[in-house]
Amino acid sequence: MELSSNTILITGGASGIGYALAERFLAAGSEVIICGRRADKLREAKEQHPQFHTRVCNVAKENERIELFEWAISEFPNLNILVNNAGIQRRVNLTENENWAETEKEIEINFCAPVHLSRLFMPHLAQREKPAIINVTSGLSFVPLANVPVYSATKAALHSFTLSLRYQLSETPIEVIEIIPPAVDTDLGGVGLHTFGVPLDEFADYVFARLQQGEIEIAYGTALKSSQASRAELDEIFKSMNQQFR
């Protein structure tokens, strides 16, 4: 994948993995647009990197996804890469009652938004040079963590969708890339919950190197192990991981 001279939209780009990728694309010579729900986080990102273009957008809402698409192709007609990175993770006890709206929001952000945005942008991307859709899934796509059941299920769904999307677009110029993180030391799910994870810069540097080499499925650490495991190995990983984090 050519890393310079692109125009890239990254959802959830004001923090975590999205922000780390945005920094690296910018340093490589690409134009970067980041969007997110929180205006304060976007301001902080722009203070650090004034070259960033920012847009407040809650991708959980269908109308805001459409508005994002219309704004992006109007303001940045050369946009050629969409990175579906935005995600939330919640611990959920399925035996307890909860507000269904919270589950619905997690599904919308983690699965519906990347599917919808991919379909919105596809006709535009097909007319650009070096177009790509990059979906950020998870090692939990392959082995669910039982205390984050909705997150795990949405990432499994997004992995499946990414495979189908890549197949359907195989005769078009649009490249479909999947980034599969392990636990990374970000604030996903809450501040301090992933301090045991891989350092963010270590993961982002690895991803960027693999993008440069042209890889289309980029997994790291425990996520790489899970993505290549046999069914018997997956069962063992599931048992061990869920005993550790119960």
Name each region found by the language model:
Residues 89-104, 147-150:
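Conserved mid-core segment of classical short-chain dehydrogenase/reductases
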Residues 12-16:
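Conserved glycine-rich cofactor-binding loop
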